[in-house]
């Protein structure tokens, strides 16, 4: 991620309130990620490299560098619970998290995350993982090694 002061600020579409937009691709230092990924691949030090994040499939250059693209689908209510637990652990209040989630996150999710999930090779159920689906993913990864 970029430093907090370098991240974009967005206005909520309905209320016009300004929020630091951590759900926008410009939040991520994509050039650094691309360089780090290339360096890790070229080093030969790693058999498997996992790139995780809600914007991973959005950038075409990053997608093209991945051998396997997975998207983990979660219901909106599960996403907010996970976000609340994580962000409250970072010291944010319930109201701070709930406000940005209600006012900005759904729009960014539709714009960048939902629209890019179709770039995945597999879409997995994040609410109820399937042992068969996980076995298929593991089998594919092992076939590349």
Stretch-by-stretch model annotation:
Residues 1-51:
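Conserved nucleotide-sensing/catalytic segment adjacent to the nucleotide-binding pocket
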Residues 2-6, 58-59, 79, 133:
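Conserved protein kinase catalytic core
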Residues 33, 70, 120:
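Residue-level signal for inorganic ion chemistry
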Residues 49-54, 103-107:
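Short gly/ser/thr-rich secondary-structure transition/capping motifs
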Residues 94-104, 132:
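An accessory alpha-helical subdomain
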């Amino acid at each position: 991620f970029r430093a907090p002061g370098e991240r974009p600020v967005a206005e909520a579409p309905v209320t016009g309130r300004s929020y630091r937009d951590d759900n926008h691709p410009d939040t991520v230092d994509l050039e650094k990620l691309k360089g780090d990924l290339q360096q890790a691949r070229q080093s030969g030090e790693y058999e498997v490299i996992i790139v995780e994040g809600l914007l991973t499939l959005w950038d075409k250059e990053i997608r093209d560098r991945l051998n396997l693209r997975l998207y983990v689908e979660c219901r909106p209510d599960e996403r907010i619970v996970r976000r609340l637990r994580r962000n409250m652990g970072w010291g944010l209040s319930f109201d701070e998290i709930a406000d940005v989630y209600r006012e900005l996150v759904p729009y960014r999710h539709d714009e960048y995350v939902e629209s890019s999930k179709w770039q995945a090779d597999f879409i997995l159920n994040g609410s109820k993982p399937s042992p068969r689906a996980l076995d298929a993913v593991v089998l594919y990864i092992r076939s590349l090694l």
